[in-house]
């Protein structure tokens, strides 16, 4: 069975591949957008993570005829009423500029005390099948914002985020966790694992 991840993000691709491997789904051939005939990527103009994930998954399956997984994810900061939210990747105005996004968020939270720095990573993953069926899973990873970046692993806002599991413990940011540790805890790991059973069913029937 072929499965398209509607992304060219190498780290997301590796993350999904690890989760499929852990589930024993060796029969699933994972593809990225670069592996299929190019198509115009849709405008992500949804108001929620689920909206945007559906837009990407539907576009992928419509253009390729291949079962497609798409995710939309970001960080929701309590003090900012849930923002950056769906704007996380382009919070500073430049899409995918992690450094600029992190710097802006830190500046906006500069004078906020530790007890009001609650945040959560949120991910919604959608599996869209060629027959029109869709399956949606959400993951949420609670924690707090740090006052400066820590760690070299991960991407996005990982260096600014201390998971709830690390508060009062080692105090590592999500960018200091190993890939395996992050998979077990993260918002995207939760959402992707929620789709594994359905992927296995589709693979068995194909």
Curated annotation (Swiss-Prot):
Q: Looking at the UniProt record for this protein, which Gene Ontology cellular component terms does it annotate, in alphabetical order?
A: cytosol
Which residues does the record give as substrate binding sites?
7-12, 73, 155-158, 182, 187-188
Catalysed reactions, semicolon-separated: XTP + H2O = XMP + diphosphate + H(+); dITP + H2O = dIMP + diphosphate + H(+); ITP + H2O = IMP + diphosphate + H(+)
Recorded coiled-coil stretches: none
Active-site annotation:
72 (proton acceptor)
Chain sites annotated for binding Mg(2+): 72
User: Which keywords label this protein?
Assistant: Hydrolase, Magnesium, Metal-binding, Nucleotide metabolism, Nucleotide-binding
Q: Which cofactor does it need?
A: Mg(2+)
User: Per the UniProt record, which EC number(s) apply here?
Assistant: 3.6.1.66
This entry's Gene Ontology molecular function terms read: dITP diphosphatase activity; ITP diphosphatase activity; metal ion binding; nucleotide binding; ribonucleoside triphosphate phosphatase activity; XTP diphosphatase activity
Tell me any Pfam family this protein matches.
Ham1p_like
Cofactor binding mode and count: Binds 1 Mg(2+) ion per subunit.
InterPro entries from the xrefs? dITP/XTP_pyrophosphatase, ITPase-like_fam, RdgB/HAM1
Q: Which Gene3D superfamilies match?
A: 3.90.950.10
What is the main EC category here? hydrolase
Q: Name one GO biological process term.
A: nucleotide metabolic process
Q: Which HAMAP family match?
A: Non_canon_purine_NTPase (MF_01405)
Q: How does it assemble?
A: Homodimer.
Q: Which family does it belong to?
A: Belongs to the HAM1 NTPase family.
Function according to Swiss-Prot or TrEMBL = Pyrophosphatase that catalyzes the hydrolysis of nucleoside triphosphates to their monophosphate derivatives, with a high preference for the non-canonical purine nucleotides XTP (xanthosine triphosphate), dITP (deoxyinosine triphosphate) and ITP. Seems to function as a house-cleaning enzyme that removes non-canonical purine nucleotides from the nucleotide pool, thus preventing their incorporation into DNA/RNA and avoiding chromosomal lesions.
Q: What is the protein name given in its UniProt record?
A: dITP/XTP pyrophosphatase
Tell me the organism. Answer: Corynebacterium glutamicum (strain R)
């Amino acid at each position: 069975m072929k499965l398209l991840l509607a992304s060219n993000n190498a780290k997301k691709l590796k993350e999904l591949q690890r989760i499929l491997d852990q589930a024993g789904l060796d029969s699933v051939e994972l593809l990225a957008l670069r592996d299929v005939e190019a198509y115009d990527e849709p405008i992500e103009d949804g108001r929620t993570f689920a909206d945007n994930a559906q837009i990407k998954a539907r576009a992928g399956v419509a253009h390729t005829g291949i079962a497609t997984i798409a995710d939309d994810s970001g960080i929701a900061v309590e003090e900012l009423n849930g923002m950056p939210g769906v704007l996380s990747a382009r919070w500073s105005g430049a899409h995918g500029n992690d450094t600029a996004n992190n710097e802006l968020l830190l500046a906006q939270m500069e004078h906020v005390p530790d007890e009001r720095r609650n945040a959560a990573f949120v991910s919604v993953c959608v599996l869209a099948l060629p027959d029109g069926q869709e399956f949606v899973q959400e993951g949420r990873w609670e924690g707090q914002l740090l006052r400066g970046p820590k760690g070299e692993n991960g991407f996005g806002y990982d260096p600014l985020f201390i998971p709830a599991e690390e508060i009062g413990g080692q105090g590592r940011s999500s960018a200091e966790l190993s890939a395996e540790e992050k998979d077990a805890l993260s918002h995207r790991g939760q959402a992707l694992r929620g789709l594994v059973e359905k992927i296995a069913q589709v693979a068995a029937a194909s």
